[in-house]
Curated annotation (Swiss-Prot):
This is GPI-anchored wall transfer protein 1. Belongs to the PIGW family. Keywords: Acyltransferase, Endoplasmic reticulum, Glycoprotein, GPI-anchor biosynthesis, Membrane, Transferase, Transmembrane, Transmembrane helix. Pathway: Glycolipid biosynthesis; glycosylphosphatidylinositol-anchor biosynthesis. GO terms for biological process: GPI anchor biosynthetic process; protein localization to plasma membrane. Glycans are attached at N395. InterPro entries: PIGW/GWT1 (IPR009447). One of its GO terms (molecular function) is glucosaminyl-phosphatidylinositol O-acyltransferase activity. It is a multi-pass membrane protein. The chain crosses the membrane at residues 15-35, 48-68, 70-90, 122-142, 156-176, 201-221, 244-264, 268-288, 309-329, 366-386, 396-416, 439-459, 464-484. One of its GO terms (cellular component) is endoplasmic reticulum membrane. It comes from Debaryomyces hansenii (strain ATCC 36239 / CBS 767 / BCRC 21394 / JCM 1990 / NBRC 0083 / IGC 2968). Probable acetyltransferase, which acetylates the inositol ring of phosphatidylinositol during biosynthesis of GPI-anchor.
Length: 493
């Protein structure tokens, strides 16, 4: 009879995944929750309490991947009805609602400041936090029988909720990291035309390397813990020694290495070249078979970790794609040609009030990016010369799937905020807390997942016990995040 460790490993192995359309429908529950939350907070004179906040922004997502995984449309309806009723009641009781929801005053003409450039946008907070919530729930839920196997990571070829989640986490990191770049570029006291200097280049790489040491240390700690505690592992996911924290830790280092290129070439072009080049290398050489073969696993350190090493190329491409969205998603006003590049203060002053073809608002930019990325993804899907979607490889199809999905999701959040939300009324403490301590919340989720697996036979839990554990887990993460946020404790790894 096999050990419990072997049973758990088998439970997450050789899976085939589900459909792309179902993945969209399930994750769109977060959009329904965001819409309902905004309708309630915008149209009712009601300050949303922590329990209601938790139910709308966490419980609904948990329900979508457990109890309502086979009836997602019903869940959408159950979530939206309270919001729609709130809007009806609010409009009925407030005759001057249109006056109160009049258009925002236009910004005064003149030169904008750095503070006006990087304003807080609730829809980005909701997007990043909901992504983190569903990721944290999934990494624990996958070890229970209640979690549908079609949502778990596939072995090699195919799509699933968790496969999408990994790439989306990296995309979100890229988007968030672009904030510092935009700020630096627009800083009037520092902003000058880029000139390559070896000393600055080396300094940037060293700075990024030092900054990422804590995340790489977490990767090492996870490796040692898994090996010494006999924790279940899925070798074909990243390899014998590699793990997701190592991938996350290496991203800023390689970003620093290609920094000179990014100062001259639009980020989305660089990302496309990387993932297309990687795809060509796989299909035109023996690299694809080298990665997928099982008989060469123990030949060297490289073959032991071949999935982690080569999939890093795809994740790096996703990271840069995420950064490319920052120039029009994070900014509070339009800057010259922000669809393709991050603007310096001199470029902004020189352009003045001119608005070119590639100067867009957040909504316009997201609409263009969504149409382009979706069209490119579906073309690649049908192309005979491109390999099928594989998170294990992080190939071209996978990269474009992740980018097109996140662009579509961001557009959805943006439209909800633009049409429905009153930013001052739709402030979720839970979403703000997760957004402010994102990587730490992800780390806590991993630690609690490990602790749960070490103390409980997850495969032996029935549905009620499983759901109770997952609710408690989500509640603990939310309380910790909100408490840290309340006292201004932010840990940036």
């Amino acid at each position: 009879m096999s050990s419990l460790k072997e049973q758990k490993e088998l439970f997450v192995s050789n899976l085939l995944g589900g459909s792309i359309s179902e993945t969209y429908n399930v994750t769109a529950v977060a959009l329904s929750a965001y819409l309902s939350y905004n309708l309630i907070s915008s149209y009712l004179d009601y300050k949303i309490t922590f329990p209601v906040d938790f139910i709308l922004n966490c419980m609904t997502i948990l329900l979508s991947i457990t109890l309502y995984s086979n009836s997602t449309n019903t869940l959408h309806l159950l979530i939206l009805v309270p919001g729609i009723l709130a809007a009806i009641v609010g409009r009925w009781g407030q005759k001057d609602v249109k006056k109160s929801r009049s258009k925002k005053p236009r910004d005064a003409k003149g030169t904008k400041t750095e503070k006006q450039l990087l304003v807080k946008k609730p829809f980005i907070t909701a997007y990043r936090s909901h992504m983190l919530v569903i990721t944290n729930f999934a990494i624990l839920a996958v070890d229970f029988r209640m979690f549908p196997r079609r949502f778990a990571k596939v072995e090699t070829w195919g799509t699933s909720l968790m496969d999408l989640g990994v790439g989306s986490f990296v995309f979100s990191m890229g988007l968030a990291s672009s904030r510092a770049i935009i700020k630096q570029r627009f800083d009037s006291s520092k902003s000058t035309d880029y000139r390559f200097k070896l000393s600055q280049y080396v300094s940037l790489i060293m700075k990024n390397s030092i900054k990422t040491l804590p995340v790489l240390a977490l990767g090492l700690i996870r490796l040692v813990s898994v090996k010494t505690l006999e924790y279940q592992e899925h070798v074909t996911e990243y390899g014998v020694h590699w793990n997701f924290f190592i991938t996350l830790g290496l991203l800023p280092i390689f970003f620093g290495i290609i920094d000179p290129v990014l100062n001259f070439v639009p980020r989305f072009v660089v990302a496309l070249v990387i993932c297309i080049g990687y795809e060509v290398l796989m299909v035109k050489t023996d690299l694809l078979s080298f990665i997928l073969r099982s008989d060469n696993r123990m030949e060297s350190l490289v073959t032991m970790n071949k999935e982690g090493i080569f999939s890093f190329i795809g994740y790096f491409s996703i990271f840069i794609f995420g950064q490319s969205f920052g120039s029009f998603v994070l900014t509070g006003f339009k800057t010259p040609n922000n669809l393709f590049r991050m603007c310096s203060y001199q470029q902004y002053k020189k352009a003045g009030a001119k608005s070119g073809l590639f100067t867009v608002t957040s909504t316009q930019g997201l609409l263009i990016a969504t149409l382009f990325s979706q069209a490119l993804f579906w073309y690649v899907q049908e192309a005979y010369f491109v390999s099928s979607i594989s998170r294990r490889l992080a190939n071209l199809s996978y990269v474009l799937w992740v980018v097109s999905y996140n662009s579509t999701l961001l557009l959805g959040y943006n439209l909800i905020e633009s049409v429905v939300a009153k930013p001052e009324a739709a402030d979720s403490k839970i979403l703000n807390a997760f957004n402010n301590n994102g990587l730490l919340s992800f780390l806590l989720g991993n630690l609690l997942t490990g602790l749960t697996n070490m103390t409980i036979n997850t495969l032996g839990c029935n549905a009620p016990v499983t759901f109770a554990i997952l609710v408690t887990y989500g509640l603990v993460l939310s309380i910790i995040a909100v408490t840290l946020d309340r006292y201004g404790i932010y840990i940036k790894l």
